[in-house]
Amino acid sequence: MLLAIDVGNTNTVLGAYEGPSLRQHWRIETSHTRTYDEYGILVRQLFQVAGLDPAAVTAVAVSSVVPPLAFTLEQMSLRYFKVKPLFVGPGVKTGMSILYENPREVGADRVVNAVAAFERWRCGLIVVDFGTATTFDAVSPKGEYLGGAICPGIAISMDALFRHASKLPRVEFQRPPHVIGKNTVASIQSGLVYGYVGLVDGICARMADELGFAPKVVATGGLAALIAGVSKTVSEVDEHLTLDGLRLLHERNR
């Protein structure tokens, strides 16, 4: 069994794979203060609650944008699963040419997403990942990573609005019934949802102009389904794209 771990700035997503099948997945808070023992005990408990045997784990693959947690997760893997983890980074076989000025600068999650998306759809595409930061990554029809864009995530945008506009109430991020809000809550929701959809559609349209072809636009991340339901450019949603990419990279680096 493969334990795939996607470490983001806010949340960490874990997946348990048997072959190509995702048996179970979990989302936990990314903690800089949690020790490797605490991570190990937590992950083993998650397995047990799901009816899975932690002893069945024979490999661990990690994508992380939080470098300080590398040692913690390595020790957790060694001590609690008796395996050396694969960290996505320089030297890992991706099967994809990285056409970036400095390939080492590309975040592990962005490479993993690009690999997974091209493996599944086999066409030129843009991957939009709604995380703490929202990332846009372009892949050529030949399967080359071309680069992309990074912008503040939805949660960051919301926090900035409420922090600097003290009279505005905090609202739930959900699609309002109309673009023209009839009350303060609906007006804020309209600005957040449709404003962010405008950002997504606008960046994807400009990228498509530069690419010179009509890319498939794939969304992943916690709010991907909501945005895709309103977006004019997002055509596919894959909640587990990053985990699937980790599984692919594990297979390519055995």
From Swiss-Prot:
Main location: cytoplasm
GO biological process, one term: coenzyme A biosynthetic process
Localization (cell): Cytoplasm
Gene name of the record: coaX
Biochemical pathway: Cofactor biosynthesis; coenzyme A biosynthesis; CoA from (R)-pantothenate: step 1/5
Binding, K(+): 129
Highest taxon listed in the record's lineage: Bacteria
InterPro entries assigned: ATPase_NBD, Type_III_PanK
Active site: 109 (proton acceptor)
Stored PANTHER family: TYPE III PANTOTHENATE KINASE
Protein name: Type III pantothenate kinase
